[in-house]
Amino acid sequence: YVFAKNANVKMPKRYLACQEGLYTNKNNDVVNFDEAVAYISDLGDCFAKPSIGTDSGNGCGVYCLVGGIDKLSGKTCREVLSGLGENFVLQERIKCHESIRKIYAGSVNTFRIMTYRWHDSIVSAPVIMRIGRGGTSWTMPTQVECL
């Protein structure tokens, strides 16, 4: 995240991260659990995902954090954070362009562009489009009344 940010690569805003139980805010400052809870209490629409061992949307979730409560589940921010475990990132929720959502609206569909070095140049492999599918451990809400 830090390298991409410094290289001006467009990425979702990172609100909070946790690695092995160590919380860091958007400025990469270390914060304790209570500070993390207070920090996220009014984020609004956001997305959390595991930072270790994730695949196909497993362990991911959409939240609407307002007034210390997740409006989607009714859980407190303290309960939400406790449930995310010790390795996760909480970030801005992104949405696909309408033309890509038409393919499958239940996930964020992405293009994967792989590059490699060949002799003295950088070459790109054929572009792959990753399309979500049903059956993961969470369902993306289609209508979120957040804030």
Enumerate the language-model features and the residues they cover.
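Conserved N-proximal alpha/beta basic substrate-recognition cap immediately N-terminal to
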Residues: 1-39, 54
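Short, basic and Ser/Thr-rich N-terminal targeting/leader segments
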Residues: 10, 46, 56, 107-109
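An acidic- and aromatic-residue-enriched active-site/binding cleft used to recognize and process polar
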Residues: 16-19, 51-53, 93, 118
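Short, solvent-exposed polar/charged micro-motifs at secondary-structure junctions
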Residues: 22-27, 57-62, 99-104
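A short catalytic or substrate-binding loop motif that flags glycine-/basic-rich loops and adjacent residues
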Residues: 40, 52-54, 104-108
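Phosphate-binding site of ATP-dependent enzymes
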Residues: 44, 68-147
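Glycine-rich phosphate-binding loop of ATP-grasp-fold ATP-dependent ligases
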Residues: 45-77
